[in-house]
């Protein structure tokens, strides 16, 4: 219940800082990829979002981040980028059409100028 559209999208995703790290208790030293939960908390606050299940703090003060909760903002960010891309494609099409019209006008002007010069050269006054 209480379903509404997410307000977290591209702005939120752009503020996140992807990092690589190794866990303190991992003797294998494997590199992991993620984000810093404390930084996510600050970004959420900057986006006006609090009281979310995305982040929890354990009794020991350890931050836990539910990475699955990042999927919806990433989907919204992709949708926002798609809309922006579509708008840019439309604008590009308009510019290409305008360029084509202008190129045609330039050709007409060149042809008219050539005809005018040829007319002056071939006029009886110049012979």
What are the functions of these language-model segments?
Residues 1-3, 51-127:
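C-terminal intramolecular chaperone/auto-processing assembly modules
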Residues 33-34, 63:
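Residues that recognize and position ribonucleotide moieties
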Residues 3-15:
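Periplasmic N-terminal gating module of Gram-negative TonB-dependent outer-membrane receptors
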Residues 18, 26, 45-48:
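Acidic glycine-/aspartate-rich tracts in secreted/extracellular proteins
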Residues 37-59:
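Active-site and glycan-interaction determinants of carbohydrate-active enzymes
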Residues 1-6, 20-33:
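Active-site-adjacent substrate-recognition loops and nearby beta-strands
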């Amino acid at each position: 219940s209480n379903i509404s559209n997410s307000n977290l999208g591209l702005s939120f995703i752009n503020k996140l800082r992807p990092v690589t790290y190794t866990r303190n208790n991992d003797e294998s030293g494997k590199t992991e990829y993620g984000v810093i939960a404390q930084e996510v908390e600050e970004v959420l606050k900057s986006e006006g979002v609090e009281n979310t299940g995305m982040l929890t703090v354990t009794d020991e003060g350890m931050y836990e981040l539910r990475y699955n909760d990042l999927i919806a903002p990433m989907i919204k960010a992709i949708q926002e980028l798609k809309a922006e891309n579509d708008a840019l494609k439309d604008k590009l099409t308009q510019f290409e059409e305008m360029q084509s019209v202008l190129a045609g006008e330039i050709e007409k002007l060149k042809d008219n100028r050539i005809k005018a010069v040829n007319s002056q050269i071939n006029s009886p006054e110049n012979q």
